[in-house]
């Protein structure tokens, strides 16, 4: 009886060990850390920067999944906006979004001017249709304001001059994860000596010497997905004044 009892105890102990090991293993991050995985996911597009000639995207293929129909070459969407609080309770936002269809080798989109209000007032928004030919933005709508017209025609996306070849050198970021979406975020403190920061300061009116934060956000699978999206933000905000640049480059099906 004592022998059988010892065998039973050993079996019970073995079951407990297996249970603890299997449960504990599920909470461990195997391989790369989430911070490294987020950076590697972003690197798939950021390694393409700077894209000086956007028409080069017609010959580049992104991540494909089951959402793509047979024969669909896909569509690149590039976006940049600059948001700034010029008055308390208001946020002015300008930028451009351009869809580059690899099937038709055409690029169409719009330049937008938005104003948001904190109080009970709907935002103002105006879109101006544009297309791209020979790597130049062509305004299709009539614009009375000569300064606005010039900004539209001379507009450059962040991805056309940004350079993230040293992305792997960004370390010790503040990582947050929402497993329900899932979504992933990591933030890094940038230096004013960073070439990307210098580029933004030379192109936009940024009335602060504060070094910005680099914020990287992913919705969806870290390995890639045509359903989710990635957004990069360089945030110069201080106190009650919002100042930021948002950028993204995505690859999705062109045919619904």
Swiss-Prot record:
A lipid is attached at residue 23 (N-palmitoyl cysteine). It comes from the Bacteria. It is a lipid-anchor. Keywords: Cell membrane, Lipoprotein, Membrane, Palmitate, Signal. Residues 1-22 form the signal peptide. The keyword Iron-sulfur does not apply. PROSITE patterns: PROKAR_LIPOPROTEIN. A lipid is attached at residue 23 (S-diacylglycerol cysteine). InterPro entries: Csa, Csa_sf. One of its GO terms (cellular component) is plasma membrane. It is found in: Cell membrane. NCBIfam families: SA_tandem_lipo (TIGR01742). Belongs to the staphylococcal tandem lipoprotein family. This is Uncharacterized lipoprotein SAS0400. It comes from Staphylococcus aureus (strain MSSA476).
